[in-house]
Amino acid sequence: MPTTPIPFTPLHMFRRLLCVGLFLFAGIHTTLGATLPLPSTSYKYTVLDQDLSAALQEFGNNLKISVNISAEVKGRIRGRIPELSPREFLDRLTDLYDLQWYYDGVVLYVSAAKEAQTRMLVLSSVHFSAFKLALDKLDISDERYPVRPAPGNGLVLVSGPPRFIALIEQTLNGLLAVAQAQPRATDTPARESVMVLFRGSSTTVVRGGRPEVFYTSEMLPENDDGGKAELSKK
């Protein structure tokens, strides 16, 4: 029977993103993608005529791995399968029956290749480098399913099995939520500076760093008493 998917709650995603920040701060490097814990010894499996889903489920049971098998995985295994390592056995079945598999660190998801999805994601305020790094640190990245940025880093094209796409979208939503929760600095308009420069009999008014008015002693405007007005620094 298919295993029920384990969803990421917002709190779970926030905690994992917080761990990403700690990894970045500490400069710790991790391996890309969650590692499927399979032994290197040969996997002995004898089958003459068995349902494909049942064989995959038994594969997980024998190796103590939770397996989620899509209802679209159909077919029967007929004939002898050579003795292979567990990873080679899994890859052989996916090649023969046009399947895809993805391991999220908890559950091995097996789906039909026709279920693969393609998404164009809008990064908004999140930079692609930060998005890709979060995928790497959360062990979501998988070299079989690349994440490709569009020119300008505003869009990302992703393709892969449903579980992989779901984690990609959840990660982006988590990063956007963290970015929106951060306080934004308010822009304070700069005060315009006004200076009056005196050089001999000439006077220059400088406003905002630009000379604006030039006076000589003969050009100063008269005050109400008929005398020359005086300029002062503001």
Swiss-Prot record:
GO cellular component, one term: membrane
InterPro entries listed in its UniProt record: NolW-like, NolW-like_sf
Subcellular location: Membrane
Keyword Transmembrane helix: yes
The entry's keywords: Membrane, Nodulation, Plasmid, Transmembrane, Transmembrane helix
Membrane-related topology note: Single-pass membrane protein
Pfam families with a match to the protein in the record: Secretin_N
Role description: Regulates cultivar-specific nodulation of soybean.
Protein name listed in UniProt: Nodulation protein NolW
Encoding gene per record: nolW
